[in-house]
Amino acid sequence: MKKAILCLLTVLPFTAGAQFFNGIGITVGATAANQKFMYRDPALVSKKNYVFGFNASVMAEMTSYDYVRWVSEIQFNQKGSVDKREEGSYANRLQYLSWNNYLKIRYELYSFIPYVLVGPRLDYTLTQATSSPDALGSYQPLHLSLAVGAGAELISYSRWKLFAEAFYVPDVMPAYTAPNLHITNKDFELRVGLKYNLHENRESCNTPVYVE
């Protein structure tokens, strides 16, 4: 009896952990990014032109509730801007590694699952190649941004699930700080992904049931 209880106590945490993780996946996509230069003296806001880049991530989806999930991911992203002036254009290009966490609110339909995503991103500056005369210093190593997005996942009988997502991501704290200048990033992202469900497909509360 003691051996049975000990075995049960050993297995339960692993079983609970396996049930907690619902799926794992990858995404790839494109990013359109720009920056806002906010000067203090004189008070002035200058919005810069867009640059285009690449993004990719590995993600995990946790919990198996019908309407609410938690998504956590590690993402590589390219941001920056083009600073156009009378004397010429200055490119600012930055590469980030981000830890993203989203609340995912979903609703299953017959052939696909629409959902919305919202949550914080912790952005780590990997590299910077900036040439704006007013911002020649180093960007912050870490800063926060907020992601708001929407997506759709195709329903299939396989454990492999295709999905597509779009995000709007503004900074909630400056990515660059100097005595007379703060810079924030903003970007729009489009991406596609492939997710592998760790558990067998099951009927949700919205799956139609046919009775003869």
Description of each model-found segment:
Residues 1-21, 198-212:
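Cleavable N-terminal export/targeting peptides
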Residues 18-61, 195-197, 212:
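Short glycine/proline- and aromatic-enriched beta-strand/turn motifs that initiate or cap beta-hairpins
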Residues 20-24, 66-70, 110-116, 142, ...:
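Outer-envelope beta-barrel architecture signal
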Residues 20-22, 48-54, 93-99, 112, ...:
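Residues that define the transmembrane beta-barrel architecture of outer-membrane proteins
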Residues 24-28, 56, 72-74, 101, ...:
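Membrane-embedded beta-strand positions of outer-membrane beta-barrel proteins
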Residues 30, 36, 59-131, 156:
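Gram-negative (and chloroplast) outer-membrane scaffold detector with strong preference
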Residues 41-46, 85-90, 132-138, 176-182:
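Extracellular loop and loop/strand-boundary signature of outer-membrane beta-barrel proteins
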Residues 71-73, 143-146, 151-212:
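Predominantly the C-terminal beta-signal and adjacent terminal strand-loop region
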